[in-house]
Amino acid sequence: MAREYKIEDYRNFGIMAHIDAGKTTMTERILFYTGKNHKIGETHDGASTMDWMEQEQERGITITSAATTTFWQGRDGKKRRFNIIDTPGHVDFTIEVERSLRVLDGAIALLDANAGVEPQTETVWRQAEKYHVPRMVFVNKMDKIGADFYRSVEMVGSRLGAVALPVQLPIGAENDFVGVVDLIEMKALTWDGTIGAPATVGEIPADMADKAEEYREKLIELAVEIDEAAMEAYLEGTMPTNDELRALIRKGTIEVKFHPILCGTAFKNRGVQPLLDAVVEFLPAPTDVPAIKGIDVKTETETTRESSDEAPLSMLAFKIMNDPFVGSLTFARIYSGKLTKGVSLENTVKGKRERIGRMLQMHSNSREDIDEAFAGDIVALAGLKETTTGDTLCDPLKPVILERMEFPDPVIEIAIEPKTKADQEKMGIALNRLAAEDPSFRVKSDEESGQTIIAGMGELHLDILVDRMKREFKVEANVGAPQVAYRESITRAAEIDYTHKKQSGGSGQFARVKIIFEPHDGDDFIFESKIVGGSVPKEYIPGVQKGIESVMGAGPLAGFPMLGVKATLIDGAYHDVDSSVLAFEIASRAAFREGAQKAGAQLLEPIMKVEVVTPEDYVGDVIGDLNSRRGQISGTEARGIAAVVNAMVPLANMFGYVNSLRSMSQGRAQYTMQFDHYEPVPTAVAQEIQKKFA
C-alpha cells in the first residue's frame, strides 16, 4: 500500500490553551467539521451529517486520545491530513508538555477573548518558544460578555513579547458577534450559528471599511519584511497578490517571526472553518521544519533524520495511554522511514528489541487497524513490552537515539496507603501503570515500616498523580506529609583495623580487615583492594565489598543512604578453618560503621535549580523571598518582556512555594525547578533533622 497523502500535505499540530479557554469545544468542533468533510465523498443523500451529529450528541465526543488523525479540504480544493496532538493542560509536568511540543510541528494557541493572555498561556508559550514551535493564535469566546479582540492582540505583544499579526477582525462582539473580516481577501464572513453551516461571504460592513484598510496595510508591511524581493517591490509601489501575501505569512510563521491571529467562537460555530484553512496555509508540514537531531549509536556523534520515507526508520514514543479496549497503547511519531506491521525494531534507549504487532490510527470517533505507516505519521502501537516515554524505536541496522531524556532522580517522597484493604491490590497496579507512563515518578516500599513510598519531582507532581489514581483507577488513598530525600557522606579519610572473632563450640568465625575510607567527588561507591601476598585470600575479597555495600543504604547520622565513599582494603588476616566469606562480610560491615563515624559523617540535602519567570514589577519580591528560603540567586535576565530569576534553593525550603509565588505575583509568575546537586546541610538544620530521624 503506497502513501495516500504526500508528506507535504501533513499538518502535525496541537492546541495550547489555558484551562478555561475552550480547548475541548474547539477540538470537538474541529473533529466535527473535518469528520463531516471526510464523510462528504462517501454519501450522496446528505444523511451522513445527521448520523454523525446524533452520534456526536449521544457520545459527547471529546478527544481523549493523545493524537487524532483527521482530514480537511483546503481553500485550493486539495485534501490535507491533520494529526492533532493533545498537549497536557497541566504545566507542572514540564517533561510532558515539552515532549508533546517536541512531536508537534506547529500549534494553535487559544485565548479567551475576555481574559486575554492568562498565566498558564504564558508558561506553555515560553516552552514552545524554547523549541521554536510555529504558532497561530485564535481568540475564542468572542460571544462572551466582556470579549475584547483588540485587547487580546495587545496582550500577545505586551505579555508574551511576541509579534501579533491579525489576519482577521471581528464583526461585532459579545451577543452581536456574527463573523469576521478576512484581511487577505478583504471580504466579510458571517455565520448564522447552526452547527456545520458554511460562512456567507459578503462585503465588509461600511462602518468597518476604514479599520479593515488600516489593519490590512499593517499586515502587508509586516509580511513583506520577511522577504527582500517582496520588500523592494512593495517599496516601489507593487502590492503582493493575495496568494503571495499568504506565502509570505506562511514563511514568517514557520520562521517564528510573527504569529497570525484569528478569532471566533467555537461554541457558536463561528470562525472554525477559516481556522482550519489557516492551519493548511500557515502551519508547517513535517518537511518545512528542520530535520530531527539524534545521536548515532555506532559512532556516538550527532546525526539527523530527514522527514522522508526513504530515510532509515526512526520514531519517538511520546505517550503511553491505557485504552479500555486495547490495553496499553504507545503513541509514537515516525520521523523518518516506513513502518510495517510485524517488523522487529531496536529500542536504542533500553538496548532491547520490540516486535511491532497491532498498529492503530486513532480517528475522532473510531480506531482503525493499519498495516503500515510513513514518515510524519503518528501511530498507536499495542502490546509493546519494553518501551516507555521518551524511547526511540528504529531500524536495528541504523541505530539512532532521537532524544536523550535525562530523567532526574525524584527529590520528594511521600508515604501512601489505600483507604480500604480492598484497594490494596488495585493501588499497586495503578502505581505501576503511572510509573510506566511517567519516568520521573518512582514507587518503592520501605523495608522497615512496610509502607509504600512514592517519589516525584515536586509536591504538585505527586498531588496530580494521586488525583489521577482516584479518577482513572478509582483508588482512594491516604497520603503522608512530603519528605525530602536527604543523603549522608563523609568529609575526611579514616583508617580502620577491625577483627571479627566468634568462638562458640565447633567451627568459629574469624576475619580481620584493615580498610581506608575516604570521600570522593562522585555520588557512587568505589571499592578497591590493594592486598598483596595473600593476607586476605582472593575468594574472600568480594565478601568485604558486599559487607560495606550492605550498610551503605543507612548512614550513621539519620539512616539516609550514603554517597561518594571510596573504600580501599589494604591489609587483613584469616584463619584456615574459621574464616569464610560471611566472616569477612561481618567484619567489613562493622569496620564501615566505625569508619563512617571517624571519617566525619555529614548530612547532604538536595539543592534545586529554580527558574522563576515573572513580570518585571515583582522581581524584587521574588528575589527577597528566595533569599529567605536559603536560596542563592545565580542571575537575572530579560526574556521578552518578562524577567527570569535563576537560583539554587534547598528543596526543604521549597514546600508550598507555588502558593506563595501565586499570591506574590497575582498569579502571573510561574516557576520550574529540577534537582541539581547535593550539598552539606548547615549545622543547625542538620541537628533538627537528626533529632527527627535518628
From Swiss-Prot:
GO terms for biological process: ribosome disassembly. Its main location: cytoplasm. The keyword Chloroplast does not apply. Residues 8-287 form the tr-type G domain. GTP binds at residues 17-24, 86-90, 140-143. One of its GO terms (cellular component) is cytoplasm. Keywords: Cytoplasm, Elongation factor, GTP-binding, Nucleotide-binding, Protein biosynthesis. It is found in: Cytoplasm. SMART domains: EFG_C, EFG_IV. Pfam families: EFG_C, EFG_III, EFG_IV, GTP_EFTU, GTP_EFTU_D2. Catalyzes the GTP-dependent ribosomal translocation step during translation elongation. During this step, the ribosome changes from the pre-translocational (PRE) to the post-translocational (POST) state as the newly formed A-site-bound peptidyl-tRNA and P-site-bound deacylated tRNA move to the P and E sites, respectively. Catalyzes the coordinated movement of the two tRNA molecules, the mRNA and conformational changes in the ribosome. This is Elongation factor G. The lineage of its organism: Bacteria, Pseudomonadati, Pseudomonadota, Alphaproteobacteria, Hyphomicrobiales.
